[in-house]
Amino acid sequence: IKFDLIMIKQTLHFFNKEKRTKLIKICKSNLRKNGVLVIFSLNTINNEIPCFKLMKQKLNRGLERDSRMIKFTCNMLKDNTIDKFKFKVLITKSKYIKMLKQKYISCLVNLNKKQINKGIKEIKDIYNKNIIFEDILICIKYKHI
């Protein structure tokens, strides 16, 4: 089976370099002529995601790794294009705290309950009732010719 579109959304960073390489090669080989591979990732610079101190440290470490991953991916996918999608986000502090408790972003996965609760206290102290920020996704687009 060949596909017209294959989309990978914010998951490549879960794989090691070898498995990422294999996945991208499999995706490329399973595209029809003029098929498109689209890979979404968080913007790696000037990220505005609301963070508590430990979360920011983990997020920045992950974004540095993601930056290297994106460069490597672009080298594998010759003649790619990169777009950025900007989303204005307005979320209540209480809703965001619920998301933190659910570990909505991968940099929170390895934090324990005590660390999350300490971070939530920081968020409560830092942010207003409504949290407004810009979320930016990078989109790498490769067309199989």
Model-flagged regions — what are they?
Residues 1-2:
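Short conserved loop adjoining the S-adenosyl-L-methionine
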Residues 7:
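A conserved beta-strand element that flanks and buttresses the S-adenosyl-L-methionine
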Residues 10-14:
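Short catalytic micro-motifs in class I SAM-dependent methyltransferases
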Residues 16-20:
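Short N-terminal helix/helix-N-cap motif within the alpha/beta-hydrolase-1
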Residues 21-36:
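A short glycine-rich, Lys/Arg-flanked "PGG" loop and its adjoining helix->strand segment in the class I
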Residues 36-66:
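Conserved class I S-adenosyl-L-methionine
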Residues 55-72, 83-88, 106-111:
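Acceptor-substrate binding/catalytic loop of class I
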Residues 80-145:
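Conserved Class I S-adenosyl-L-methionine
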